[in-house]
Regions:
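N-terminal Sec-pathway targeting helices
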Residues: 1-15
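Short sequence/structural segments immediately N-terminal
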Residues: 4-5, 34-38, 70-72, 156
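Extended surface/linker regions that mediate inter-domain or inter-protein docking
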Residues: 20-21, 25, 156-160
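Electrostatic cytochrome c docking/interface patches
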Residues: 25-69
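C-terminal capping alpha-helices of c-type cytochrome domains
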Residues: 40, 119-136, 140-166
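Detector for the c-type heme attachment site
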Residues: 46-49, 77-84, 162-163
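Short loop/beta submotifs within extracellular cysteine-rich repeat domains
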Residues: 51-53, 86, 107-109, 135-137, ...
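Gly/Gly-Pro-rich "capping" loops immediately C-terminal to redox-active cysteine motifs
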Residues: 57-122, 143-149
Length: 166
């Protein structure tokens, strides 16, 4: 009797999980992220869906469509609605400090390890999005995806990061 109850409960949890995975894209704005967003950049930042209605493929070393989908695939999932990031607790209670990615922050000089680092250019921001490499050659932390985005998509995201700075 106990085994049958556990089996029924297990199947019920499985069904709830599958229903959740299938319906979440529609809740956040359609299966293609097509809710009302004022710009392509806002849509990508908020949902992860690019100009063709698909989530851009992640590059090796990042997440994206693979295991990372369990953690989310949109910038907002880690960097928050305002782009300021902050402390994020992930699965297994692991916490990371997520950086502020507003344009004003990325393009301003800052102190790092006692040295002043120059602000990033638009092409350096694009490179970090695509390859996960900072202008100084250091790799971004592993949770940060490396996205195979079109020039239009990257430009739209950078423009949206500028909007977050206002």
């Amino acid at each position: 009797m106990k085994n049958k109850t556990l089996l029924v409960m297990g199947l019920a949890l499985l069904v709830v999980g599958v229903v959740g995975i299938v319906t979440v894209p529609y809740i956040i704005g359609g299966a293609d992220g097509s809710a009302d967003y004022s710009t392509l950049g806002e849509r990508i930042y908020s949902t992860g869906y690019g100009e063709n209605g698909q989530i851009p493929r992640s590059m090796p070393g990042g997440r994206g469509r693979g295991a990372g989908m369990m953690m989310g695939a949109a910038c907002v999932d880690c960097h928050r609605e305002d782009g300021r990031g902050g402390r994020l607790t992930m699965m297994m209670r692991q916490s990371i400090d997520v950086p502020d990615i507003r344009y004003s922050t990325l393009t301003s000089s800052h102190d790092e390890n006692g040295e002043t680092e120059p602000g990033w250019t638009d092409s350096e921001i694009a490179e970090a999005i695509r390859t996960g490499v900072e202008p100084n050659g250091e790799q971004l932390r592993a949770p940060m995806p490396r996205w195979d985005m079109t020039n239009t998509e990257v430009d739209a995201v950078i423009t949206y990061l500028e909007e977050l700075s206002k």
